[in-house]
Amino acid sequence: MKPRVGFFDFTCCEGCQLQIADLEEEIIGLADIVDIVEFREVLTGSAASYDIALIEGSITRNSDEERVKDIRKRSKILVEFGACAHLGGVNKLKNLRDETAVRREVYGDAWNMPHLNTYPTRAVHEVVKVDAAIPGCPVNRREFITIVKALAMGLPPKLPDYPVCVECKKRDNVCLYDIGMACLGPVTRAGCDAICPTHKSACEGCRGLVPDPNKNSMRDVLAKNGISLDEVFRMFTMYAIDPEVLP
Protein backbone atom coordinates (compact mmCIF):
# COMPACT_ATOMS: atom_id res chain seq x y z
CA MET A 1 0.00 0.00 0.00
CA LYS A 2 1.36 3.41 -0.98
CA PRO A 3 2.05 6.00 1.75
CA ARG A 4 -0.79 8.51 2.11
CA VAL A 5 0.35 12.13 1.67
CA GLY A 6 -1.46 15.33 2.59
CA PHE A 7 -0.56 18.97 1.88
CA PHE A 8 -1.70 21.71 4.27
CA ASP A 9 -1.36 25.48 4.17
CA PHE A 10 -1.22 27.97 7.02
CA THR A 11 0.03 31.58 6.90
CA CYS A 12 1.81 31.76 3.54
CA CYS A 13 1.42 32.70 -0.11
CA GLU A 14 1.01 29.02 -1.08
CA GLY A 15 3.82 29.44 -3.60
CA CYS A 16 5.53 26.26 -2.46
CA GLN A 17 2.42 24.22 -3.20
CA LEU A 18 2.21 25.93 -6.59
CA GLN A 19 5.75 24.71 -7.26
CA ILE A 20 4.52 21.17 -6.73
CA ALA A 21 1.33 21.67 -8.75
CA ASP A 22 3.56 22.91 -11.60
CA LEU A 23 5.51 19.64 -11.65
CA GLU A 24 2.95 18.38 -14.20
CA GLU A 25 4.29 15.04 -15.54
CA GLU A 26 6.64 14.60 -12.58
CA ILE A 27 3.79 14.76 -10.08
CA ILE A 28 2.16 11.91 -11.98
CA GLY A 29 5.36 9.93 -11.45
CA LEU A 30 5.27 10.83 -7.77
CA ALA A 31 1.72 9.49 -7.62
CA ASP A 32 3.14 6.08 -8.58
CA ILE A 33 5.03 6.08 -5.26
CA VAL A 34 2.62 7.85 -2.90
CA ASP A 35 -1.12 8.34 -2.65
CA ILE A 36 -1.87 12.09 -2.51
CA VAL A 37 -5.07 12.13 -0.46
CA GLU A 38 -5.28 15.84 0.42
CA PHE A 39 -3.99 18.84 -1.55
CA ARG A 40 -6.39 21.77 -1.65
CA GLU A 41 -4.83 23.43 -4.69
CA VAL A 42 -5.12 20.28 -6.81
CA LEU A 43 -7.97 18.09 -5.55
CA THR A 44 -11.04 18.19 -3.32
CA GLY A 45 -10.51 15.08 -1.22
CA SER A 46 -9.50 14.80 2.43
CA ALA A 47 -8.49 12.01 4.78
CA ALA A 48 -8.58 11.06 8.45
CA SER A 49 -4.89 10.16 8.73
CA TYR A 50 -1.63 10.53 6.81
CA ASP A 51 1.67 8.74 6.51
CA ILE A 52 3.32 12.01 5.45
CA ALA A 53 1.89 15.48 6.15
CA LEU A 54 3.53 18.45 4.42
CA ILE A 55 2.91 21.76 6.16
CA GLU A 56 3.36 25.04 4.29
CA GLY A 57 3.13 28.32 6.17
CA SER A 58 3.90 29.72 9.60
CA ILE A 59 1.77 29.59 12.74
CA THR A 60 0.28 32.99 13.57
CA ARG A 61 -3.03 32.36 15.36
CA ASN A 62 -4.49 30.17 18.08
CA SER A 63 -6.60 28.42 15.46
CA ASP A 64 -3.43 27.65 13.45
CA GLU A 65 -1.83 26.11 16.51
CA GLU A 66 -4.85 23.93 17.25
CA ARG A 67 -5.06 22.79 13.63
CA VAL A 68 -1.37 21.91 13.23
CA LYS A 69 -1.45 19.97 16.51
CA ASP A 70 -4.43 18.02 15.21
CA ILE A 71 -2.61 17.25 11.94
CA ARG A 72 0.43 16.16 13.96
CA LYS A 73 -1.71 13.67 15.92
CA ARG A 74 -3.07 12.19 12.69
CA SER A 75 0.29 11.93 10.88
CA LYS A 76 3.14 9.44 11.12
CA ILE A 77 5.63 11.88 9.57
CA LEU A 78 5.26 15.66 9.58
CA VAL A 79 7.38 17.82 7.28
CA GLU A 80 7.74 21.60 7.43
CA PHE A 81 7.68 22.68 3.83
CA GLY A 82 9.11 26.01 2.61
CA ALA A 83 10.66 28.96 4.43
CA CYS A 84 7.48 30.12 6.19
CA ALA A 85 7.01 26.73 7.85
CA HIS A 86 10.73 26.06 8.32
CA LEU A 87 11.89 29.46 9.61
CA GLY A 88 8.75 31.52 10.17
CA GLY A 89 9.64 33.32 6.95
CA VAL A 90 8.72 36.86 6.01
CA ASN A 91 5.76 36.59 8.37
CA LYS A 92 8.17 36.83 11.30
CA LEU A 93 9.00 40.41 10.30
CA LYS A 94 5.95 41.48 12.29
CA ASN A 95 7.59 40.10 15.44
CA LEU A 96 10.10 42.96 15.25
CA ARG A 97 7.38 45.55 15.92
CA ASP A 98 4.55 46.18 18.34
CA GLU A 99 1.72 43.82 17.42
CA THR A 100 -1.07 46.38 17.84
CA ALA A 101 0.78 48.91 15.69
CA VAL A 102 1.25 46.31 12.95
CA ARG A 103 -2.43 45.34 12.99
CA ARG A 104 -3.54 48.99 12.84
CA GLU A 105 -1.22 49.64 9.90
CA VAL A 106 -2.43 46.60 7.95
CA TYR A 107 -6.14 46.52 8.79
CA GLY A 108 -6.92 50.15 9.64
CA ASP A 109 -10.14 50.67 11.59
CA ALA A 110 -10.88 46.93 11.48
CA TRP A 111 -7.65 46.03 13.30
CA ASN A 112 -9.41 44.71 16.42
CA MET A 113 -11.99 42.49 14.70
CA PRO A 114 -11.98 39.00 16.30
CA HIS A 115 -11.31 37.19 13.02
CA LEU A 116 -8.06 39.16 12.65
CA ASN A 117 -6.65 38.00 15.99
CA THR A 118 -3.01 36.99 15.72
CA TYR A 119 0.04 36.36 17.86
CA PRO A 120 3.82 36.40 17.25
CA THR A 121 4.69 34.24 14.27
CA ARG A 122 6.29 30.85 14.88
CA ALA A 123 7.81 28.22 12.62
CA VAL A 124 6.08 24.84 12.63
CA HIS A 125 8.81 23.14 14.68
CA GLU A 126 8.30 25.77 17.38
CA VAL A 127 4.77 24.43 17.90
CA VAL A 128 4.88 20.67 17.16
CA LYS A 129 7.46 17.95 16.65
CA VAL A 130 8.73 17.94 13.07
CA ASP A 131 10.37 14.94 11.42
CA ALA A 132 11.91 16.64 8.38
CA ALA A 133 12.21 19.99 6.63
CA ILE A 134 12.20 21.06 2.99
CA PRO A 135 13.63 24.60 3.01
CA GLY A 136 13.42 27.43 0.50
CA CYS A 137 11.25 30.25 -0.80
CA PRO A 138 9.90 28.62 -2.80
CA VAL A 139 11.06 25.04 -2.33
CA ASN A 140 13.29 23.48 -4.95
CA ARG A 141 11.12 21.05 -6.89
CA ARG A 142 13.87 18.49 -7.49
CA GLU A 143 14.76 18.50 -3.81
CA PHE A 144 11.09 18.09 -2.91
CA ILE A 145 10.76 14.99 -5.10
CA THR A 146 13.97 13.51 -3.68
CA ILE A 147 12.94 14.04 -0.06
CA VAL A 148 9.38 12.75 -0.47
CA LYS A 149 10.67 9.64 -2.25
CA ALA A 150 13.15 9.04 0.56
CA LEU A 151 10.45 9.40 3.22
CA ALA A 152 8.12 7.10 1.28
CA MET A 153 10.84 4.44 1.24
CA GLY A 154 11.58 4.85 4.94
CA LEU A 155 14.95 6.53 4.35
CA PRO A 156 16.22 9.61 6.23
CA PRO A 157 16.09 12.69 3.98
CA LYS A 158 19.36 14.51 3.42
CA LEU A 159 19.91 18.23 2.96
CA PRO A 160 23.17 19.78 1.75
CA ASP A 161 25.52 20.63 4.62
CA TYR A 162 27.54 23.18 2.65
CA PRO A 163 26.82 26.84 1.74
CA VAL A 164 25.35 28.36 -1.40
CA CYS A 165 28.85 29.58 -2.33
CA VAL A 166 29.75 26.01 -3.30
CA GLU A 167 26.93 25.95 -5.85
CA CYS A 168 28.01 29.35 -7.18
CA LYS A 169 31.49 27.93 -7.78
CA LYS A 170 30.01 24.94 -9.60
CA ARG A 171 28.11 27.31 -11.88
CA ASP A 172 31.17 29.53 -12.49
CA ASN A 173 29.31 32.54 -11.12
CA VAL A 174 31.13 35.79 -10.46
CA CYS A 175 30.94 36.38 -6.70
CA LEU A 176 28.43 39.12 -5.97
CA TYR A 177 30.83 40.59 -3.41
CA ASP A 178 33.26 41.19 -6.27
CA ILE A 179 30.70 43.47 -7.92
CA GLY A 180 29.86 45.35 -4.72
CA MET A 181 26.77 43.43 -3.57
CA ALA A 182 26.14 41.93 -0.13
CA CYS A 183 25.03 38.29 -0.13
CA LEU A 184 24.23 35.69 2.53
CA GLY A 185 25.52 32.81 0.40
CA PRO A 186 28.55 32.14 2.65
CA VAL A 187 26.33 31.11 5.59
CA THR A 188 23.14 29.87 3.87
CA ARG A 189 22.40 26.19 3.27
CA ALA A 190 22.79 25.14 -0.37
CA GLY A 191 20.28 23.12 -2.38
CA CYS A 192 18.77 25.88 -4.50
CA ASP A 193 21.41 25.56 -7.25
CA ALA A 194 22.42 29.15 -6.41
CA ILE A 195 19.44 30.41 -8.39
CA CYS A 196 19.46 33.95 -6.99
CA PRO A 197 23.19 34.76 -7.32
CA THR A 198 23.17 33.19 -10.80
CA HIS A 199 20.71 35.91 -11.81
CA LYS A 200 22.71 38.64 -10.04
CA SER A 201 20.32 38.76 -7.09
CA ALA A 202 21.72 38.41 -3.59
CA CYS A 203 21.05 35.30 -1.54
CA GLU A 204 18.79 36.39 1.33
CA GLY A 205 18.98 33.18 3.33
CA CYS A 206 15.60 31.63 2.53
CA ARG A 207 16.98 28.13 3.15
CA GLY A 208 18.28 28.94 6.61
CA LEU A 209 21.79 28.70 7.94
CA VAL A 210 24.21 26.00 6.88
CA PRO A 211 25.19 23.77 9.83
CA ASP A 212 28.11 25.32 11.72
CA PRO A 213 28.35 28.45 9.52
CA ASN A 214 31.85 29.85 9.02
CA LYS A 215 31.41 33.13 10.87
CA ASN A 216 35.02 34.21 10.55
CA SER A 217 35.03 33.74 6.79
CA MET A 218 31.81 35.73 6.45
CA ARG A 219 33.20 38.59 8.54
CA ASP A 220 36.41 38.57 6.50
CA VAL A 221 34.45 38.79 3.24
CA LEU A 222 32.43 41.73 4.56
CA ALA A 223 35.52 43.57 5.77
CA LYS A 224 37.41 42.94 2.51
CA ASN A 225 34.56 44.40 0.48
CA GLY A 226 33.75 47.32 2.78
CA ILE A 227 30.22 46.13 3.59
CA SER A 228 28.84 46.98 7.01
CA LEU A 229 27.42 44.47 9.45
CA ASP A 230 24.28 46.63 9.69
CA GLU A 231 23.52 46.08 6.01
CA VAL A 232 23.88 42.33 6.38
CA PHE A 233 21.85 42.27 9.61
CA ARG A 234 18.93 43.78 7.69
CA MET A 235 19.19 40.94 5.16
CA PHE A 236 19.10 38.36 7.95
CA THR A 237 15.72 39.63 9.14
CA MET A 238 13.99 38.85 5.83
CA TYR A 239 13.69 35.16 6.68
CA ALA A 240 13.96 35.42 10.46
CA ILE A 241 17.57 34.24 10.66
CA ASP A 242 19.24 35.21 13.93
CA PRO A 243 21.84 37.89 13.06
CA GLU A 244 23.83 36.78 16.11
CA VAL A 245 25.48 34.35 13.70
CA LEU A 246 27.85 37.30 13.19
CA PRO A 247 28.36 38.64 16.73
Question: Predicted segment positions?
Answer:
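Portal/gating segments that form or line small-molecule/metal binding sites
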Residues: K94
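Iron-sulfur (Fe-S) cluster-binding modules
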Residues: M1-L54, I59, S63-L78, D98-P247
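Short gly/pro/ser/thr-enriched loop/turn and capping motifs at secondary-structure boundaries
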Residues: C84-G89
